[in-house]
From Swiss-Prot:
Task performed by this protein: Cytochrome c oxidase is the component of the respiratory chain that catalyzes the reduction of oxygen to water. Subunits 1-3 form the functional core of the enzyme complex. CO I is the catalytic subunit of the enzyme. Electrons originating in cytochrome c are transferred via the copper A center of subunit 2 and heme A of subunit 1 to the bimetallic center formed by heme A3 and copper B.
N-acetylthreonine PTM positions: 2
Record GO terms (molecular function): cytochrome-c oxidase activity; heme binding; metal ion binding
Cross-link 1'-histidyl-3'-tyrosine (His-Tyr), sequence positions: 264-268
Pfam family, one: COX1
Residues that, per the record, bind Fe(II)-heme a: 86, 399
Protein name: Probable cytochrome c oxidase subunit 1
EC numbers for this chain: 7.1.1.9
Database matches in PANTHER family: CYTOCHROME C OXIDASE SUBUNIT 1
Transmembrane segments: 40-60, 89-109, 121-141, 170-190, 213-233, 258-278, 290-310, 315-335, 359-379, 398-418, 433-453, 476-496
Catalytic activity: 4 Fe(II)-[cytochrome c] + O2 + 8 H(+)(in) = 4 Fe(III)-[cytochrome c] + 2 H2O + 4 H(+)(out)
PROSITE patterns tied to this protein: COX1, COX1_CUB
Amino acid sequence: MTAEAPPLGELEAIRPYPARTGPKGSLVYKLITTTDHKMIGIMYCVACISFFFIGGLLALLMRTELAAPGLQFLSNEQFNQLFTMHGTIMLLFYATPIVFGFANLVLPLQIGAPDVAFPRLNAFSFWLFVFGATIGAAGFITPGGAADFGWTAYTPLTDAIHSPGAGGDLWIMGLIVAGLGTILGAVNMITTVVCMRAPGMTMFRMPIFTWNIMVTSILILIAFPLLTAALFGLAADRHLGAHIYDAANGGVLLWQHLFWFFGHPEVYIIALPFFGIVSEIFPVFSRKPIFGYTTLVYATLSIAALSVAVWAHHMFATGAVLLPFFSFMTYLIAVPTGIKFFNWIGTMWKGQLTFETPMLFSVGFMVTFLLGGLTGVLLASPPLDFHVTDSYFVVAHFHYVLFGTIVFATFAGIYFWFPKMTGRLLDERLGKLHFWLTFIGFHTTFLVQHWLGDEGMPRRYADYLPTDGFQGLNVVSTIGAFILGASMFPFVWNVFKSWRYGEVVTVDDPWGYGNSLEWATSCPPPRHNFTELPRIRSERPAFELHYPHMVERLRAEAHVGRHHDEPAMVTSS
């Protein structure tokens, strides 16, 4: 007998199946007991995207309600619950924890560490977030319904008289528990970055994403304990009659100061990591090193420092804050953000650009975030802010900066690192469909809301009069919202299909031009990430490993410092 080998062209890589499947329930047991940072990162991402879908569903209900005046298929109370829980879920149960999803997936790999510094604390942080978020959202199944005082929880709306019932209490306790998980996660990330970098990985050789996670974690340690303390005070007011936020002693403004001193650093806590994600993606698809690495780091540090000095721009309309100071500081924080834009543009400038899905989402992030940033500069001016505060103009502004940053960069990161985590590539055609539906749906929904706010439509209203003239733009906005909702279908199908049947990745770096260390190990990485580490001589160790013939040229062309092989430049006067 002779055996005939198949032609080489017919052979394709397949993922080998395990010798046998484990006993029933073994996967659940593994998920509950795991301390592997990669597994925990995937669990964070799945949980956060699930909450993102729930928050989006609440938003669709609100947009449907506002499509026409007098519709009232939701009661006013239900509408209040929806906008409260929508804001809470999106900001605190999706945006903040998914930061730790990406940090867990990528950060130990980027610094050449076998795991995070405290693996069990890492798992504990995740479960605190899951249970805290579940407690916070559980108000929907109580007789009085969920919390209905807005995600900012302004007093006296949150006191026992105006918001009786379990929904508000569950909201407060859920945020305390989830916030504790966030604080512990930040402690873990700072320790990991400081103590577990590979030999040769100096601070200024760390990837930008790692820098941003470290700075974000420091901000979390500044902001979140304050929120926890403020929430405990609110619970004491509701149950013990503590009178901390009593209007009679100025407590209403005290709550606003405490909340926004958390709230403004919070928006940078959920922006900086996503700046880091796109800063990892632009160089790879531009075939160039990041432009202005050091400047990017200092811009990140500047944003973090300034973010704790602008909180009262949320309070211009109270008349109780120093307008010139907070206005000036808000203008000032736009400067380092603008510097980042020039870094990203400089990275793409004259690069060999290709527009795979991660790059598309990153460019979508830049366009959307730029528009949101410009309306932010408008709102930094108190005379303008007085006119549009608490209107749909503000709603449009913060959705542009938050959706533009978090959602576009989340999807960019998922498409970028999915092959590293699973060993399979996501489908490019579905990815591009997902991007264009998201981009068109988002801008259709929120661009018109600037004009609605300018015409005087207040936020958080469940209805409006036919004579107000708001219906046309609201219909456009609602249509956009449903397009945005539909954009999630190709994404979910893509992840489900590719997880099981996607093209298998057979190389360490499927994109071909990866810079940081995660592209110097297998897809997916082994349990402790690396079997061997390349030498780290710059901020691009994986690129230098895969393109050793480029190293000398990269050193020669790097416009930093003086080259020792050239004579010193002599200047004559």
